[in-house]
Swiss-Prot record:
The modification Phosphoserine is found at residues 828-829. The lineage of its organism: Eukaryota, Metazoa, Chordata, Craniata, Vertebrata. It comes from Mus musculus (Mouse). GO terms for molecular function: DNA-binding transcription repressor activity, RNA polymerase II-specific; retinoic acid-responsive element binding; zinc ion binding. Gene3D superfamilies: Classic Zinc Finger (3.30.160.60). Residues 1-26, 650-736, 804-832, 855-897, 935-988, 1133-1261 are annotated as: Disordered. This is Zinc finger protein 536. Belongs to the krueppel C2H2-type zinc-finger protein family.
Length: 1302
């Protein structure tokens, strides 16, 4: 094989013939052999079938190789590497087997890849839409094809400026320019060879030293400086290049002076010469300095111009930018430009010039019936209309006036008065004159464009072109169809010849408005006239007949101030009235005395009236009849700079007309429309209700609403409907005639719903009215509790629910405060009820004595609140006599009919699907349902019922006859489950609530501690007042023998109970606790008919109304013993009713003195059993509930085994009550701590029923304070910890082991 191997030309036939190769060659061969070894290894892994196969023809070379391998160790390194390289070369040749194996590989194994490549080529072929007709190559762009065609035509438009070389592309010529380096640019062409550069520098320095030495000896002559200036002048003016064959370096070259300021320095100091700016050398003559700079600092000079550079790269880049670009633009060299001018081929459509006919032919494909959108200014054509639209921005930007006069920046200069460029396009001048009309700041300057073209100041040629341009407009103005006159330009007789020109003019108008919106007087005129005519012609309701269109199209509109109406002014000056519809629309727009936009269409008409007042007197045929000021008030005639100032000024006239137009508000229809909005007090009441309830529709009848104070004016099925209360007090200041006109126009619905301020469009007039409040700043929806005001009713509703929820939902005082203590929080007691008046009116039509408008709650309902339970007063320390007197003063028997009527009305409301929420639900239940239940229970009470003379026992006896099953059904029907947690509404026992700045502050009744957090108040009471009492010993030293009984009852904590004495029997309270968590769930499951139930209508202590006090101690395992006053919640004896069985097993120490101590003494006395009973117990049960209006325990539920098991009773805080059960010995053991000084007098116990009058009056308040302290339970905190009871009537949780067996 005679082929050369891949190893740098080493022959493959004689590997051992060249053992004398040199080291560098061997190193190169070794590197190449390594590379070949890597390639062959990679190929062997990639293509295993291409491994070298045994070939019989190559046995001899193989034997030679074996022979060569044997002495390989004895050969030199060079010969070994050569043999290895040749062997690798033969392996590659054998494995690939030439091009045949490669072809088989491509055809056989990689067909999938080849198919993919073919698909890619097909896609690329599709993307390349421009094929070459000669060679078949395809290109993506036509410009690339035109460059490719130069290879076939031989055109080379780019010529080298230094030689005769030409290139078809600019990049090729730049590559050629790199060859002209280091003297190759031509000898003597402004540069000195590198070998002569150092010689010239040394020569210059020697000459400089000699001159300096001579100058120090000889004085300078005075005639040298004029000579230098005289020589500088001709050199500066001579800019001719040196001839190409000139190579003498001594000739001065006219290079510009690098620092002309040296001339002035030379004139001042005659001894100094010319200084070089690069090396600071001095020369006496200018020629010497130029020669010095050209030789040393700027040796590279351009032969085509005067440019000189210090580096060669700068000179080449200068030639590429300056000279090649110029040559490429011409398409030919500088010498051949005149010769090829006859061979130019120009496009007749766009005027582009080509050097070859073939280029012109390819260029003509662009104009193949596709560029049909032509620009009327420059003549360019486009395929798509949006291309033309974007192109028009170029002309508009050129026409815009960006710079004003520097002396008067505030004065607007009309475009008609500006000097235009001499070479500006004729169409551009016409458009600028058209635009100058829109930019006129006043009427006087509007005639400038007409004077420019009317006085013959234009040349004849321009007049002729303008006449051709304007002739289609004038001819089309007479032949405009009637339908086209409805448009804006049709009314103005400005119909353009083409659609593109129309777009152009509209863009010019918009651009004019953007440049100076204040002084764009005629632009505002054009818009105002267009709105007036569009409103008059295009509205369906205001569509005029054909005979009215032509007079309106040729007339002007003038506002007559005396008659206050618009009149049409003809071309001859005659006046006539406008059509009724058009007059109505403009008159309504002129009513600016309604700032609240009573008519939702007034916003657009106000803008229209602004245009009509100043601009509609402008004759539609031309600008010659304008007489009004730009922005003039129609009432007083004052002129303002902007339209917004006129709108603000119009409010002054509105205030002046208030006194004159008050008589018009007496009408019934207007009164019904306005409702109680004129009365400030009633307006505040109506605004304090739900925004939806005060809205009134325009279709309100004469007698359809209630005109009383605070009542709803009209049933509003649409809460968002516009109303007088939404608009405000000044909404109805217009006269009755204007009101009728507004209603009639609203029914027609013919006005535009576009905002005159920002241009937004709205579907309905109501949305426009609401939107206009943003611009006017009107906020009619005011909050009755703070200074907030909103533009929409939804904003006020959100504000009320976000910041005043407790005031909006609470019908009476805040939860936790007695209703008769109005001095504590008057604002909460006067909070309004948010009830829809239309629903209440339908429910209470048959109730003449019920009035919801007088206040948040009527007097009857307040009395009902007191009658339903006087426990509120008792819980805060009020005597029972006061509450009973208030109960008697309410005159319940006389009001019983009202309660039944209210109950029926409430049922009617509930049956209609109305659901009261939150505190309003509890409010309605506590006043309506309680009266119904009282009436029912009074009828069901047996005649032989036990006589009860205590005031609080009466309600408990009535409620005791009700069954628990009935109680559950009633609560499920009228009292839905309220899962909301409102920690700020209720109060803790032992604390009071005051509301300041919408924040509920809880104050401790025992100290001066105040906080806004109920959790902190609960912790404060637990740590400082209730908990401290537990940790103290008994102050009187009384020993209580209750350890053994406490140990016998495992897991039970016995509360201190009170045993009645001989003369007065008081029921004791014993709270029983089971610390086992299993019994927590067993307690409610084991309830029977004798189980205690909570009161029907709760106060702040009732869990059904407020779960906080009852759930607070649940985490400590404390359970309230009873939630009621007259009904003990424990399992009492069934067979005993008024007898007391004292147990003598426990020693009882009763002091004989009675004393009133402070609340701290009470708390200290009340915890004496803690030292004995808390040793063997995990939890302590302590509670004395203070609610006297709760369900009493039926007498049949008394426990039979009262002596063996402890019974629970309740300590009544207000008055002595009859004995309801027996006191167990377990309860007697803890009795003595209650007979300490200040609590109970020492009296002999006696059997029988005591009289309530026998109770000492001084006992009521200490017992009330004690009950407040002891009723402080741990159930409320569980509401915040997720431990709240799900049932609303959570009373006591009884102990199954202590209850009687049923």
């Amino acid at each position: 094989m005679e082929e050369a191997s891949l190893c740098l030309g080493v022959s493959s036939t004689a590997p051992e013939a060249e053992p004398h190769l040199s080291g560098p060659v061997l190193n190169g061969q070794y590197a190449m052999s390594q590379k070949l070894h890597q390639i062959t290894s990679q190929l062997s892994h990639a293509f295993p079938e291409l491994h070298p196969r045994p070939n019989p023809e190559e046995k001899t070379p193989a034997a030679l190789e074996e022979k060569a391998h044997v002495p390989m160790s004895g050969q030199s390194m060079g010969s070994q590497m050569a043999l290895l390289a040749n062997q690798l070369g033969r392996d590659v040749d054998n494995s690939l087997n030439g091009r045949v194996d490669l072809q088989q590989f491509l055809n056989g194994q990689n067909l999938g890849i080849m198919s993919q490549m073919s698909d890619i080529e097909d896609d690329a072929r599709k993307n390349r839409k421009y094929p070459c007709p000669l060679c078949g190559k395809r290109f993506r762009f036509n410009s690339i094809l035109s460059l490719h065609m130069r290879t076939h035509t031989g055109e080379k438009p780019f010529k080298c400026p230094y030689c005769d070389h030409r290139a078809a592309q600019k990049g090729n010529l730049k590559i050629h320019l790199r060859t002209h380096k280091l003297g190759n640019l031509g000898k003597g062409r402004g540069r000195v060879r590198e070998e002569n550069r150092l010689l010239h520098e040394l020569e210059e320095r020697a000459i400089l030293r000699d001159k300096q030495m001579k100058g120090s000896l000889l004085q300078p002559r005075s005639d040298l400086k004029p000579l230098a200036h005289a020589q500088q002048a001709p050199l500066a003016t001579c800019n001719l290049a040196l001839p190409p064959n000139h190579s003498v370096p001594d000739v001065a070259h006219p290079a510009p002076s690098p620092k002309p300021a040296n001339l002035q320095e030379d004139s001042v100091t005659p001894a100094a010469g010319f200084r070089c700016t690069f090396c600071k050398g001095k020369f006496k003559k200018r020629e010497e300095l130029d020669r010095h700079i050209r030789i040393l600092h700027k040796p590279y000079k351009c032969t085509l111009c005067d440019f000189a550079a210090s580096q060669e790269e700068e000179l080449i880049s200068h030639v590429e930018k300056a000279h090649i670009t110029a040559e490429s633009a011409q398409g030919q060299g500088p010498n051949g430009g005149g010769e090829q001018s006859a061979n130019e081929f120009r496009c007749e459509v766009c005027g582009q010039v080509f050097s070859q006919a073939w280029f012109l032919k390819g260029h003509m494909r662009k104009h193949k019936d596709s560029f049909e959108h032509c620009c009327q200014i420059c003549g360019r054509r486009f395929k798509e209309p949006w291309f033309l639209k974007n192109h028009m921005k170029v002309h508009l930007n050129k026409l815009s006036v960006k710079n004003k006069s520097p002396t008067e920046p505030e004065v607007a200069v009309p475009m008609g008065g500006l000097s235009q460029e001499a070479h500006a396009n004729l169409y551009s001048r016409y458009l600028s004159c058209l635009q100058s009309g829109f930019m006129a700041p006043d009427k006087a300057s509007l005639n400038e464009p007409s004077q420019l073209y009317g006085k013959g100041e234009l040349p004849a040629k321009e007049k002729e072109v303008l006449g051709k341009l304007l002739s289609p407009i004038s001819s089309m103005a007479h032949s405009v169809p009637e339908g086209d006159k409805h448009s804006l330009l049709g009314c103005l007789n400005l119909v353009p010849p083409l659609k593109s020109s129309c777009i152009e003019r509209l863009q010019a108008a918009a651009k004019a408005a953007e440049m100076d919106p204040v002084n764009s007087y005629q632009a505002w005129q054009l818009m105002a006239r267009g709105m007036a005519m569009e409103h008059g012609f295009l509205s369906k309701e205001h569509q005029l007949s054909r005979n009215h269109e032509d007079p309106l199209a040729n007339t002007g509109v003038l506002f007559d101030k005396e008659k206050r109406e618009y009149v049409l002014v003809g071309a001859d000056g005659s006046k006539q009235k406008m059509p009724a519809d058009l007059v109505h629309s403009t008159k309504v727009g002129n009513q600016r005395d309604l700032p609240n936009k009573l008519d939702p269409l007034e916003g657009s008409r106000e803008f229209l009236s602004h245009g009509l007042n100043q601009t509609l007197d402008y004759n539609l045929q031309g600008p010659g009849n304008m007489k009004e000021k730009p922005t003039e008030c129609p009432d007083c005639g004052r002129v303002f700079r902007t339209y917004h100032q006129v709108v603000v000024h119009s409010r002054v006239h509105k205030r002046d007309r208030k006194s004159d137009e008050d008589a018009l508000h007496v009408g019934v229809g207007l009164e019904e429309r306005r409702g109680s909005g004129s009365d400030q007090e009633s307006q505040s009441v109506s605004r304090s209700t739900t925004p939806g309830s005060s809205n009134v529709t325009e279709e309100s009848g004469a007698g359809g609403g209630l005109s009383q104070t605070g009542s709803a004016q009209e049933d509003s099925p649409h809460p968002s409907s516009p109303s007088s209360s939404d608009i405000g007090e000044e909404a109805g200041r217009a006269g009755g005639v204007q009101q009728q006109a507004l209603l009639r126009d609203r029914n027609l619905g013919s006005a535009m719903k576009d905002c005159p301020y920002c241009g937004k469009t709205f579907r309905t007039s109501h949305h426009l009215k609401v939107h206009l409040r943003i611009h006017t700043g009107e906020k009619p929806y005011k909050c009755p509790h703070c200074d907030y005001a909103g533009t929409q009713s939804a904003s006020l509703k959100y504000h009320l629910e976000r910041h005043h929820r407790e005031r909006q939902n609470g019908a009476g005082p805040l939860s936790g405060q007695p209703p008769n203590q109005e001095h504590k929080d008057e604002t909460s007691s006067k909070a309004p009820m948010f009830i829809r008046p239309d629903i209440l009116r339908g429910a209470f039509k048959g109730l003449p004595g019920i009035d919801f408008r007088g206040g948040p709650a009527s007097q009857q309902w307040t009395a009902g609140m007191l009658s339903s339970g006087d426990h509120s007063g008792q819980a805060t320390g009020m005597p029972s006599e006061l509450s009973s007197d208030a109960l008697k003063g309410s005159d319940l028997p006389s009001k019983s009919s009202h309660y039944s009527e209210i109950g029926r009305a409430y049922q009617n409301i509930v049956s209609n699907g109305v659901n009261f929420q939150g505190s309003l639900q509890a409010f309605m239940d506590s006043f309506v349902l309680s009266s119904l239940k009282k009436k029912d229970t009074k009828d069901k009470v047996p005649s032989d019922a036990h006589p009860m003379k205590a005031h609080t026992a009466e309600g408990g006896e009535e409620k005791a006859s009700m069954k628990p099953s009935q109680r559950k059904s009633e609560k499920s029907q009228y009292e839905p489950l309220d899962l909301s947690v409102r920690p700020d509404a209720p109060t803790l026992p032992g604390s009071s609530v005051t509301v300041q700045d919408s924040i509920a502050w809880h104050g401790c009744l025992f100290c001066a501690f105040t906080t806004s957090s109920m959790e902190l108040m609960a912790l404060h009471l637990q740590a400082n007042h209730l908990g401290r009492a537990k940790r103290k010993d008994h102050p009187t030293g009384v020993t209580v023998n209750c350890k053994e009984q406490g140990r016998e009852a495992s897991k039970v904590s016995v509360l201190p109970s009170l045993q009645s004495n001989k003369e007065m029997a008081l029921p004791s309270a014993v709270g029983v606790l089971d610390s086992a968590p299993e019994k927590l769930a067993q307690g409610p499951a084991k309830e029977t008919l004798g189980d205690p139930k909570s009161g029907q209508w709760p106060n702040h202590m009732d869990p059904a109304f407020c779960t906080f006090p009852s759930d607070f101690y649940k985490q400590f395992g404390v359970y309230p013993a009873m939630v009621g006053s007259g009904a003990p919640g424990s399992c009492l004896n069934k067979n005993t009713e008024g007898k007391t069985h004292p147990d003598d097993d426990a020693p009882i120490l009763i002091p004989e003195t009675t004393n009133k101590n402070t609340t701290d003494d009470l708390s200290d006395i009340a915890s004496s059993e803690d030292m004995d009973s808390s040793k063997g117990e995990n939890n302590e049960d302590e509670e004395l509930d203070t609610e006297p209006e709760m369900t009493s325990k039926p007498l049949s539920a008394l426990s039979k085994d009262g002596s063996s098991e402890g019974g629970d009773s309740l300590l009544s805080p207000g008055a002595p009550q009859p004995i309801q059960g027996l006191v167990s010995p377990l309860a007697q053991a803890a009795e003595e701590q209650w007979h300490s000084p200040g609590l109970l007098p020492a009296q002999d116990p006696s059997a029988g029923l005591p009289k309530p009058e026998r109770g000492p009056p001084g006992l009521e308040k200490p017992m009330s304070m004690l009950s407040v302290l002891r009723a402080y339970s741990a159930d409320g905190l569980a509401a915040f910890n997720g431990l709240a009871s799900s049932t609303a009537n959570s009373g006591c949780i009884k102990r199954p082991d202590l209850c009687g067996k049923f």
